[in-house]
Amino acid sequence: MIKYVLISALLVVAVYSFTIEDNEDALLEEAEDELDTEEERRMALPPGAVCNGHKSDCQCFGAKYKCSCPFLWRFRRSAECHCKKGWAWTAIKKRSCHNRYQWSG
């Protein structure tokens, strides 16, 4: 009986330690995201400028502009993404951008 209690207590401690590590990782990721949003707030790229395809469309200036990348751009070294005009749903998607005050009237 005591063995079962000790084993279950060790199991609880192990699970608790893993959840603490996950929480620390989540806090680090949140801090990195906050830094990225601070960058996005500071600058918005003009239409036609080279943008980072791995980031959100918020980096492009204007409600309907998005970061458009060529087909299979990740596998080509010379391929660059550019801020190009998108569809109306791009403006709907960009309503949640932190830097929307720069282009909204």
From Swiss-Prot:
This is U2-lycotoxin-Ls1b. The lineage of its organism: Eukaryota, Metazoa, Ecdysozoa, Arthropoda, Chelicerata. It comes from the Eukaryota. Belongs to the neurotoxin 04 (omega-agtx) family. 01 (type I omega-agtx) subfamily. InterPro entries: Toxin_34 (IPR013605). The keyword Nucleotide-binding does not apply. Residues 1-17 form the signal peptide. Expressed by the venom gland. Pfam families: Toxin_34. GO terms for molecular function: potassium channel regulator activity; toxin activity. Keywords: Disulfide bond, Ion channel impairing toxin, Neurotoxin, Potassium channel impairing toxin, Secreted, Signal, Toxin, Voltage-gated potassium channel impairing toxin. Disulfide bonds join 51-67, 58-97, 60-83, 69-81. It comes from Lycosa singoriensis (Wolf spider). It is found in: Secreted. Residues 18-41 form a propeptide. GO terms for cellular component: extracellular region. Insecticidal to house crickets. It induces an excitatory slow-onset impact that leads to irreversible spastic paralysis. It also modifies human voltage-gated potassium channel Kv1.5/KCNA5. Most likely, it binds to the voltage-sensing domain of the channel, suggesting it does not block the pore but prevents its opening at physiological membrane potentials. The recombinant peptide binds to the channel in an irreversible manner and slows down the hKv1.5 current activation kinetics. It is not toxic to mice, when intracranially injected (at 0.5 ug/g mouse).
